[in-house]
């Protein structure tokens, strides 16, 4: 028999494997997975435990006959210890019918880069998340875009020109509400640095800054963030990123739990071609006691409504990115569906909730400098757009849930907000069957 011991600060949880049975004993509650063999034993074990300790700051110690050094474990005495730095969670919950991309985040769209700067102190929980649609010069090679305001209690910047011209010409920044002027200034400054023609031989630039109010966990009046924080996030642009209480999501609260940055992607197949549609959210909405939370179709809020009550307010910003060749009219139709994904998590878009959505396609680059009177673009026929609608709804719902599942307990100047995993017994029961990770 192999024995696995999971240690945290207060308890030892024992997992045993014997013949064709995997048994979990957690807080005196027994869970049994049957009809497995030694070949898939390891996978079942890791899927359960990796998810369980992700936000628990615990350790997994293995004592048994299987060499786990090629499976995220390091040698420790006569046994092995799980190295969480080697584990990349890609999915905690399965939403909908469509397949996800490999990373299950917005970087599954080829060329998309994300950079973040997080500020976490006793007084401040704020930051900035930067999304660059492609590695090139966004001002000189703009992307087709659209926006939609579902509930306009918000201060996001740059939407007027998006709606008029149908393009985006800067990276998209996501931050706290009172930071938007500082971050917009930084976006402009970086654009001027990269494009000396701006304001001299060509026009000006339209910075895109999305915001949510992070005042629950952040002393936002101090406007602690600086332009250098944006520049640092920009310098950290990469094709993968962390989710949860990071970047622009550091101070966000969702359904009374720690919210923030969440993302998910969907694969769309049209004929022999494969495309990706992905969503990134900054979640900061929902009733304060969690009573409205719907988790993967289940009213989880009915079981965990123990927090201080307040109305559905806050905000959510949603960025939809796809490599489908959509024009700005079609993109607006797609991003309107974000509201359906959000509502499936329990929101009714209250009076004080600023719900704003931006969508862009990387398929057609619009050149800023060109002498041609006409340009050729590829556009998908409307008759094929239903798959994009479904992908948007599914990815938005999953991104919202991911923003909570990846977040941890956060202390601010006025409040302590717990991650959803505080209610780990309910949490485990709901998500265990669909845990996925990158191997």
Predicted regions and their residues:
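Amphipathic, interaction-prone secondary-structure segments
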Residues: 2-17
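Short polybasic amphipathic segments
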Residues: 4, 22-24, 51, 291
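Short linear proline/tyrosine/threonine-rich motifs used for host-factor recruitment
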Residues: 13-15, 22-24, 30
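A short, exposed loop/beta-hairpin motif centered on an aromatic-Gly-Thr core
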Residues: 27-37
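Mixed-charge, Lys/Arg-enriched low-complexity segments
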Residues: 37-69
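Alpha/propeptide regions of enzymes that mature by internal proteolysis
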Residues: 74-439
């Amino acid at each position: 028999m192999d024995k696995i011991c999971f240690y945290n600060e207060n308890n030892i949880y024992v997992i045993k494997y014997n013949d064709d049975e995997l048994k979990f004993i957690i807080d005196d509650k027994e869970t049994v997975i049957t009809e497995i063999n030694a070949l898939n034993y390891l996978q079942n074990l890791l899927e359960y435990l990796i998810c369980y300790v992700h936000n628990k700051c615990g350790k997994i110690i293995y004592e048994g006959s299987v060499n786990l050094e090629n499976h995220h474990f390091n040698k420790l005495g006569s046994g092995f210890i799980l190295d969480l730095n080697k584990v990349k969670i890609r999915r905690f919950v399965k939403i909908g019918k469509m397949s996800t991309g490999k990373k299950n985040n917005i970087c599954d769209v080829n060329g998309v880069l994300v950079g973040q700067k997080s500020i976490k102190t006793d007084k401040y929980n704020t930051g900035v998340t930067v999304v660059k649609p492609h590695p090139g010069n966004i001002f000189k090679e703009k992307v087709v875009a659209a926006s939609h305001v579902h509930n306009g209690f918000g201060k996001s910047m740059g939407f007027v020109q998006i709606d008029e011209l149908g393009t985006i010409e800067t990276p998209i920044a996501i931050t706290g509400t009172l930071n938007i002027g500082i971050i917009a200034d930084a976006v402009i400054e970086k654009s001027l640095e990269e494009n000396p023609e701006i304001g001299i031989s060509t026009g000006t630039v339209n910075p895109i800054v999305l915001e949510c109010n992070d005042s629950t966990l952040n002393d936002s009046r101090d406007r602690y963030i600086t332009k250098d924080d944006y520049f640092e996030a920009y310098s950290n642009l990469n094709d993968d990123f962390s989710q949860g209480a990071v970047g622009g999501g550091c101070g966000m609260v969702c359904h009374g739990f720690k919210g923030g940055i969440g993302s998910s992607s969907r694969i769309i197949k049209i004929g022999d071609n494969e495309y990706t549609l992905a969503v990134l959210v900054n979640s900061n909405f929902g009733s304060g006691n969690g009573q409205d939370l719907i988790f993967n179709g289940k009213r989880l809020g009915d079981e965990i409504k123990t927090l201080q009550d307040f109305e559905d307010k806050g905000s959510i910003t949603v960025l939809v990115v796809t490599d489908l060749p959509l024009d700005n009219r079609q993109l607006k139709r797609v991003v309107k569906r974000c509201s359906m994904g959000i509502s499936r998590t329990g929101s009714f878009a209250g009076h004080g909730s600023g719900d704003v959505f931006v969508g862009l396609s990387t398929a057609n680059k619009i050149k800023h400098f060109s002498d041609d009177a006409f340009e050729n673009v590829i556009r998908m026929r409307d008759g094929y757009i239903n798959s994009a609608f479904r992908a948007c709804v599914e990815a938005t719902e999953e991104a919202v849930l991911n923003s909570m599942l990846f977040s941890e307990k956060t202390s601010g100047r006025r409040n302590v907000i717990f991650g959803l995993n505080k209610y780990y017994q309910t949490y485990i029961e709901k998500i265990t069957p669909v845990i996925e990770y990158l191997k």
